[in-house]
């Protein structure tokens, strides 16, 4: 099975940061990305297991994959397509 985390357009390492900093950094990073690009997020804050999926739902980005069984947690987010 191929590793979906291997070729993101950008990587954001939020390890060592605690809520709300990881989600704030994700939001800032995604804002500067093109629609459809993929962001790999590395995190070690347990709150991200709730916050990253909630952020994606609220902002309508796609949470393509998440791996939270071991550290660092990994999340792969696709920026939503532009709306006309």
From Swiss-Prot:
Keyword tRNA processing: yes
Active-site residues, record numbering mapped to chain: 19
Lipid metabolism recorded as keyword: no
A GO cellular component entry from the record: cytoplasm
PROSITE patterns on file: UPF0033
GO terms (BP aspect): tRNA wobble position uridine thiolation
InterPro entries named in the record: Sulphur_carrier_TusA, TusA-like, TusA-like_sf
A single GO molecular function term of this UniProt record: sulfur carrier activity
Major site of localization recorded for this protein: cytoplasm
Its biological purpose: Sulfur carrier protein involved in sulfur trafficking in the cell. Part of a sulfur-relay system required for 2-thiolation during synthesis of 2-thiouridine of the modified wobble base 5-methylaminomethyl-2-thiouridine (mnm(5)s(2)U) in tRNA. Interacts with IscS and stimulates its cysteine desulfurase activity. Accepts an activated sulfur from IscS, which is then transferred to TusD, and thus determines the direction of sulfur flow from IscS to 2-thiouridine formation. Also appears to be involved in sulfur transfer for the biosynthesis of molybdopterin.
Oligomer and partners: Interacts with IscS.
Protein name: Sulfur carrier protein TusA
The organism of origin for this protein: Photorhabdus laumondii subsp. laumondii (strain DSM 15139 / CIP 105565 / TT01) (Photorhabdus luminescens subsp. laumondii)
Lineage: Bacteria, Pseudomonadati, Pseudomonadota, Gammaproteobacteria, Enterobacterales
């Amino acid at each position: 099975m191929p590793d979906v985390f291997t070729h993101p357009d950008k990587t954001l390492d939020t390890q060592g940061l605690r809520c709300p900093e990881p989600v704030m950094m994700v939001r800032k990073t995604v804002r500067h990305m093109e629609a459809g690009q993929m962001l790999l997020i590395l995190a070690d804050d347990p709150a991200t297991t709730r916050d990253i999926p909630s952020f994606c739902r609220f902002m309508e980005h796609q949470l393509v994959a998440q791996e939270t069984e071991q550290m660092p947690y990994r999340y792969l987010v696709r920026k939503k397509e532009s709306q006309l």
